[in-house]
Amino acid sequence: LGDVYKRQELNNRKVAVIGCGFVGATSAFGLMQSGLFSEMVLIDANTEKAEGEAMDISHGIPFARPMKIYAGGYDDIMDAAIIVVTAGANQKPGETRLDLVQKNVGIFKSIIPEIAKRDYQGILLIVSNPVDILTYTAHKLSGMPENRVIGSGTVLDTARLKYELGEHLGVDSRSVHAFIIGEHGDSEIAAWSSANVSGIPLNTFCEMRGHFNHDDSMERIAANVRNSAYEIIAKKNATYYGIAMSVKRICEAIVRDEKSILPVSGMIHGMYGVEDVVLSMPAIVGKNGIERQVPISLDEDEQKQLQKSAQILKEMAEQVL
Protein backbone atom coordinates (compact mmCIF):
# COMPACT_ATOMS: atom_id res chain seq x y z
CA LEU A 1 0.00 0.00 0.00
CA GLY A 2 3.00 2.30 0.37
CA ASP A 3 3.28 5.02 2.96
CA VAL A 4 0.20 6.30 4.72
CA TYR A 5 0.27 10.07 5.21
CA LYS A 6 -1.77 12.03 7.71
CA ARG A 7 -3.43 15.13 6.28
CA GLN A 8 -1.67 18.19 7.65
CA GLU A 9 -3.23 21.44 8.76
CA LEU A 10 -2.02 24.30 6.59
CA ASN A 11 0.29 27.02 7.82
CA ASN A 12 -0.87 30.19 6.07
CA ARG A 13 2.57 31.76 6.59
CA LYS A 14 4.47 28.97 4.83
CA VAL A 15 5.38 28.60 1.16
CA ALA A 16 7.30 25.91 -0.73
CA VAL A 17 9.19 26.27 -4.01
CA ILE A 18 9.94 23.14 -6.06
CA GLY A 19 12.74 23.75 -8.56
CA CYS A 20 15.67 26.06 -7.79
CA GLY A 21 16.72 27.13 -11.27
CA PHE A 22 16.67 30.79 -12.36
CA VAL A 23 12.87 31.13 -12.02
CA GLY A 24 12.58 29.19 -8.75
CA ALA A 25 15.46 30.98 -7.04
CA THR A 26 14.36 34.44 -8.20
CA SER A 27 10.77 33.69 -7.12
CA ALA A 28 12.04 32.55 -3.71
CA PHE A 29 14.05 35.78 -3.40
CA GLY A 30 10.95 37.84 -4.29
CA LEU A 31 8.80 35.92 -1.81
CA MET A 32 11.39 36.45 0.94
CA GLN A 33 11.12 40.21 0.39
CA SER A 34 7.31 40.18 0.16
CA GLY A 35 6.65 39.85 3.89
CA LEU A 36 3.86 37.36 3.10
CA PHE A 37 5.55 34.34 4.67
CA SER A 38 7.56 33.45 7.78
CA GLU A 39 8.71 30.06 6.50
CA MET A 40 9.92 28.89 3.09
CA VAL A 41 11.18 25.47 2.03
CA LEU A 42 13.12 24.93 -1.21
CA ILE A 43 13.25 21.61 -3.05
CA ASP A 44 15.41 20.65 -5.99
CA ALA A 45 16.53 17.38 -7.58
CA ASN A 46 20.02 18.74 -6.85
CA THR A 47 19.92 19.04 -3.04
CA GLU A 48 23.10 21.12 -2.91
CA LYS A 49 21.56 23.70 -5.25
CA ALA A 50 18.53 24.03 -2.94
CA GLU A 51 20.80 24.31 0.11
CA GLY A 52 22.97 26.96 -1.57
CA GLU A 53 19.97 29.06 -2.61
CA ALA A 54 18.43 28.76 0.88
CA MET A 55 21.71 29.94 2.46
CA ASP A 56 22.21 32.80 0.01
CA ILE A 57 18.63 34.10 0.34
CA SER A 58 18.71 33.65 4.16
CA HIS A 59 21.65 36.04 4.40
CA GLY A 60 19.33 38.84 3.25
CA ILE A 61 16.85 38.26 6.09
CA PRO A 62 18.43 40.92 8.39
CA PHE A 63 17.43 43.46 5.70
CA ALA A 64 13.87 42.11 5.42
CA ARG A 65 11.63 40.42 8.03
CA PRO A 66 12.40 37.42 10.27
CA MET A 67 11.89 34.21 8.32
CA LYS A 68 13.02 30.60 8.24
CA ILE A 69 14.35 29.46 4.84
CA TYR A 70 15.73 25.96 4.32
CA ALA A 71 16.16 23.14 1.80
CA GLY A 72 13.91 20.16 2.41
CA GLY A 73 11.96 17.23 0.99
CA TYR A 74 8.32 16.50 0.18
CA ASP A 75 7.43 15.76 3.81
CA ASP A 76 8.45 19.32 4.69
CA ILE A 77 6.02 21.01 2.32
CA MET A 78 2.66 19.44 3.05
CA ASP A 79 1.54 22.15 5.47
CA ALA A 80 2.54 24.98 3.09
CA ALA A 81 -0.33 27.29 2.11
CA ILE A 82 1.09 27.44 -1.44
CA ILE A 83 3.42 25.12 -3.34
CA VAL A 84 5.08 26.93 -6.26
CA VAL A 85 6.32 24.52 -8.95
CA THR A 86 9.02 25.93 -11.23
CA ALA A 87 10.88 22.66 -11.91
CA GLY A 88 11.50 21.65 -15.50
CA ALA A 89 13.83 21.87 -18.45
CA ASN A 90 14.22 25.11 -20.38
CA GLN A 91 13.65 25.35 -24.12
CA LYS A 92 16.94 24.90 -25.97
CA PRO A 93 17.70 26.45 -29.36
CA GLY A 94 16.27 24.25 -32.12
CA GLU A 95 13.95 22.43 -29.72
CA THR A 96 10.21 22.49 -30.42
CA ARG A 97 7.71 23.29 -27.69
CA LEU A 98 6.41 19.74 -28.03
CA ASP A 99 9.89 18.35 -27.22
CA LEU A 100 9.92 20.55 -24.13
CA VAL A 101 6.39 19.48 -23.16
CA GLN A 102 7.29 15.80 -23.22
CA LYS A 103 10.41 16.38 -21.14
CA ASN A 104 8.56 18.44 -18.53
CA VAL A 105 5.49 16.19 -18.36
CA GLY A 106 8.01 13.45 -17.49
CA ILE A 107 9.43 15.61 -14.68
CA PHE A 108 5.90 16.36 -13.42
CA LYS A 109 5.16 12.62 -13.30
CA SER A 110 7.81 12.35 -10.60
CA ILE A 111 6.80 15.50 -8.67
CA ILE A 112 2.98 15.73 -8.64
CA PRO A 113 2.27 12.17 -7.34
CA GLU A 114 4.55 12.94 -4.35
CA ILE A 115 2.26 15.87 -3.51
CA ALA A 116 -0.96 13.95 -4.27
CA LYS A 117 -0.16 10.94 -2.08
CA ARG A 118 0.32 13.23 0.92
CA ASP A 119 -3.26 14.52 0.49
CA TYR A 120 -2.14 18.13 0.09
CA GLN A 121 -4.84 20.67 0.99
CA GLY A 122 -3.31 23.96 -0.14
CA ILE A 123 -2.86 25.75 -3.47
CA LEU A 124 -0.64 24.37 -6.21
CA LEU A 125 0.81 27.19 -8.34
CA ILE A 126 2.37 25.91 -11.57
CA VAL A 127 4.97 28.16 -13.20
CA SER A 128 7.01 25.71 -15.33
CA ASN A 129 6.56 26.01 -19.10
CA PRO A 130 4.56 25.40 -21.20
CA VAL A 131 2.44 26.44 -18.24
CA ASP A 132 -1.04 25.66 -19.63
CA ILE A 133 -0.20 22.05 -20.54
CA LEU A 134 1.66 21.50 -17.28
CA THR A 135 -1.21 22.95 -15.22
CA TYR A 136 -3.51 20.52 -17.06
CA THR A 137 -1.01 17.71 -16.28
CA ALA A 138 -0.95 18.73 -12.60
CA HIS A 139 -4.80 18.65 -12.52
CA LYS A 140 -4.87 15.16 -13.95
CA LEU A 141 -2.02 13.72 -11.85
CA SER A 142 -3.00 15.31 -8.52
CA GLY A 143 -6.75 14.73 -8.48
CA MET A 144 -7.01 18.05 -6.61
CA PRO A 145 -10.06 20.33 -7.05
CA GLU A 146 -9.68 22.52 -10.14
CA ASN A 147 -9.80 25.80 -8.21
CA ARG A 148 -6.71 24.81 -6.20
CA VAL A 149 -4.46 24.03 -9.19
CA ILE A 150 -3.49 27.34 -10.81
CA GLY A 151 -1.02 28.23 -13.54
CA SER A 152 0.84 31.55 -13.64
CA GLY A 153 -0.76 31.85 -17.07
CA THR A 154 -0.64 35.20 -18.85
CA VAL A 155 -0.12 37.28 -15.70
CA LEU A 156 3.36 38.21 -16.98
CA ASP A 157 2.21 38.72 -20.60
CA THR A 158 -0.53 41.03 -19.30
CA ALA A 159 2.06 42.99 -17.30
CA ARG A 160 4.18 43.27 -20.45
CA LEU A 161 1.14 44.56 -22.36
CA LYS A 162 0.39 47.15 -19.65
CA TYR A 163 4.05 48.21 -19.62
CA GLU A 164 4.15 48.61 -23.43
CA LEU A 165 0.88 50.59 -23.46
CA GLY A 166 2.06 52.76 -20.57
CA GLU A 167 5.25 53.59 -22.49
CA HIS A 168 3.33 54.20 -25.72
CA LEU A 169 0.82 56.54 -24.07
CA GLY A 170 3.07 58.16 -21.47
CA VAL A 171 0.91 57.04 -18.53
CA ASP A 172 1.36 54.94 -15.40
CA SER A 173 1.04 51.30 -16.53
CA ARG A 174 -1.09 50.62 -13.43
CA SER A 175 -3.81 52.82 -14.94
CA VAL A 176 -3.94 50.61 -18.04
CA HIS A 177 -6.59 47.86 -17.95
CA ALA A 178 -6.01 45.25 -20.63
CA PHE A 179 -5.54 41.48 -20.70
CA ILE A 180 -3.60 38.91 -22.65
CA ILE A 181 -5.71 35.72 -22.67
CA GLY A 182 -5.46 32.17 -24.03
CA GLU A 183 -2.17 30.31 -24.22
CA HIS A 184 0.93 31.62 -22.46
CA GLY A 185 2.81 31.41 -25.73
CA ASP A 186 2.62 32.01 -29.45
CA SER A 187 -1.18 31.80 -29.82
CA GLU A 188 -1.92 34.29 -27.01
CA ILE A 189 -4.54 36.98 -27.68
CA ALA A 190 -4.46 40.65 -26.73
CA ALA A 191 -8.07 41.44 -25.78
CA TRP A 192 -8.04 44.91 -27.36
CA SER A 193 -11.81 45.34 -27.56
CA SER A 194 -12.16 45.54 -23.76
CA ALA A 195 -8.92 47.50 -23.11
CA ASN A 196 -9.21 50.88 -21.40
CA VAL A 197 -7.17 53.45 -19.53
CA SER A 198 -8.91 54.30 -16.24
CA GLY A 199 -12.31 53.59 -17.81
CA ILE A 200 -11.67 55.50 -21.05
CA PRO A 201 -11.77 53.19 -24.11
CA LEU A 202 -8.23 52.57 -25.37
CA ASN A 203 -8.69 54.08 -28.84
CA THR A 204 -10.26 57.24 -27.37
CA PHE A 205 -7.38 57.61 -24.93
CA CYS A 206 -4.82 57.01 -27.71
CA GLU A 207 -6.36 59.87 -29.72
CA MET A 208 -6.21 62.12 -26.64
CA ARG A 209 -2.46 61.42 -26.62
CA GLY A 210 -2.05 62.10 -30.35
CA HIS A 211 -2.01 58.50 -31.62
CA PHE A 212 -4.42 57.84 -34.50
CA ASN A 213 -2.91 54.85 -36.30
CA HIS A 214 -4.53 52.24 -34.05
CA ASP A 215 -4.09 49.08 -36.13
CA ASP A 216 -0.35 49.55 -36.62
CA SER A 217 0.22 50.36 -32.95
CA MET A 218 -1.85 47.39 -31.79
CA GLU A 219 0.01 45.02 -34.11
CA ARG A 220 3.42 46.33 -33.02
CA ILE A 221 2.62 46.23 -29.30
CA ALA A 222 1.07 42.73 -29.45
CA ALA A 223 4.16 41.48 -31.33
CA ASN A 224 6.49 43.09 -28.76
CA VAL A 225 4.61 41.34 -25.96
CA ARG A 226 4.53 37.99 -27.76
CA ASN A 227 8.22 38.08 -28.72
CA SER A 228 9.70 39.68 -25.61
CA ALA A 229 10.57 36.35 -23.94
CA TYR A 230 12.41 35.17 -27.08
CA GLU A 231 14.26 38.47 -27.24
CA ILE A 232 15.30 38.33 -23.57
CA ILE A 233 16.41 34.69 -23.94
CA ALA A 234 18.48 35.62 -27.01
CA LYS A 235 20.17 38.40 -25.03
CA LYS A 236 20.65 36.80 -21.57
CA ASN A 237 19.64 33.10 -21.92
CA ALA A 238 16.62 33.17 -19.59
CA THR A 239 13.79 35.32 -18.24
CA TYR A 240 13.21 35.31 -14.51
CA TYR A 241 12.65 38.74 -12.90
CA GLY A 242 9.28 39.42 -14.54
CA ILE A 243 7.92 35.94 -13.80
CA ALA A 244 9.21 36.13 -10.20
CA MET A 245 7.21 39.35 -9.72
CA SER A 246 4.17 37.60 -11.22
CA VAL A 247 4.55 34.69 -8.76
CA LYS A 248 4.76 37.17 -5.87
CA ARG A 249 1.61 38.95 -7.11
CA ILE A 250 -0.40 35.71 -7.36
CA CYS A 251 0.77 34.57 -3.90
CA GLU A 252 -0.22 37.97 -2.49
CA ALA A 253 -3.76 37.61 -3.86
CA ILE A 254 -4.06 34.11 -2.34
CA VAL A 255 -2.49 34.72 1.10
CA ARG A 256 -4.26 38.05 1.66
CA ASP A 257 -7.52 36.72 0.13
CA GLU A 258 -7.58 39.83 -2.06
CA LYS A 259 -10.15 38.64 -4.65
CA SER A 260 -7.85 40.18 -7.27
CA ILE A 261 -8.69 39.69 -10.93
CA LEU A 262 -5.66 38.05 -12.54
CA PRO A 263 -5.33 36.18 -15.87
CA VAL A 264 -4.19 32.86 -14.40
CA SER A 265 -4.40 29.46 -16.12
CA GLY A 266 -7.35 27.35 -15.08
CA MET A 267 -9.68 24.72 -16.47
CA ILE A 268 -12.30 26.23 -18.80
CA HIS A 269 -15.79 24.74 -19.00
CA GLY A 270 -17.90 26.13 -21.82
CA MET A 271 -16.79 29.78 -21.79
CA TYR A 272 -16.74 31.14 -25.39
CA GLY A 273 -17.37 27.58 -26.59
CA VAL A 274 -14.13 26.32 -25.02
CA GLU A 275 -14.37 23.04 -23.10
CA ASP A 276 -12.01 20.94 -20.92
CA VAL A 277 -8.83 22.84 -21.67
CA VAL A 278 -6.54 24.85 -19.39
CA LEU A 279 -5.77 28.38 -20.56
CA SER A 280 -5.69 31.92 -19.18
CA MET A 281 -8.77 33.99 -18.54
CA PRO A 282 -9.18 36.77 -15.98
CA ALA A 283 -10.25 35.13 -12.71
CA ILE A 284 -11.04 36.20 -9.17
CA VAL A 285 -8.12 34.89 -7.11
CA GLY A 286 -8.30 34.55 -3.33
CA LYS A 287 -7.56 32.15 -0.48
CA ASN A 288 -9.33 29.28 -2.29
CA GLY A 289 -7.38 29.80 -5.50
CA ILE A 290 -9.55 30.50 -8.54
CA GLU A 291 -12.90 31.57 -7.11
CA ARG A 292 -14.46 32.12 -10.53
CA GLN A 293 -13.45 33.07 -14.05
CA VAL A 294 -14.58 36.43 -15.36
CA PRO A 295 -15.85 36.46 -18.97
CA ILE A 296 -14.57 39.74 -20.42
CA SER A 297 -16.27 41.01 -23.55
CA LEU A 298 -14.47 39.85 -26.70
CA ASP A 299 -15.26 40.79 -30.28
CA GLU A 300 -15.89 38.08 -32.88
CA ASP A 301 -12.28 37.97 -34.07
CA GLU A 302 -10.91 37.67 -30.52
CA GLN A 303 -13.34 34.84 -29.77
CA LYS A 304 -12.18 32.98 -32.90
CA GLN A 305 -8.55 33.48 -31.91
CA LEU A 306 -9.31 32.18 -28.40
CA GLN A 307 -10.99 29.07 -29.80
CA LYS A 308 -7.96 28.51 -32.05
CA SER A 309 -5.60 28.92 -29.08
CA ALA A 310 -7.70 26.42 -27.10
CA GLN A 311 -7.57 23.93 -29.99
CA ILE A 312 -3.75 24.16 -30.16
CA LEU A 313 -3.50 23.50 -26.41
CA LYS A 314 -6.01 20.64 -26.56
CA GLU A 315 -4.11 18.90 -29.36
CA MET A 316 -0.83 19.31 -27.52
CA ALA A 317 -2.31 17.91 -24.29
CA GLU A 318 -3.67 14.89 -26.18
CA GLN A 319 -0.23 14.19 -27.67
CA VAL A 320 1.54 14.05 -24.33
CA LEU A 321 -1.02 12.74 -21.83
What feature does the model see in each segment?
Residues 24-25:
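N-terminal Rossmann-fold NAD(P) dinucleotide-binding loop
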Residues 31:
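Aromatic pocket-lining residues of Rossmann-like dinucleotide-binding sites
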Residues 96-162:
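Rossmann-like NAD(P)(H) cofactor-binding subdomain of soluble oxidoreductases
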Residues 62-123:
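Rossmann-like NAD(P)-binding element
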Residues 142-148, 157-321:
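C-terminal substrate-binding/catalytic lobe of Rossmann-fold NAD(P)-dependent dehydrogenases
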Residues 20-21:
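Glycine-rich Rossmann-fold phosphate-binding loop(s) that bind the pyrophosphate
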Residues 1-5:
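Short, small-residue-biased leader/transition segments that mark boundaries at the very start
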Residues 39, 43-81, 95, 314-319:
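Conserved N-terminal Rossmann-fold NAD(P) cofactor-binding segment
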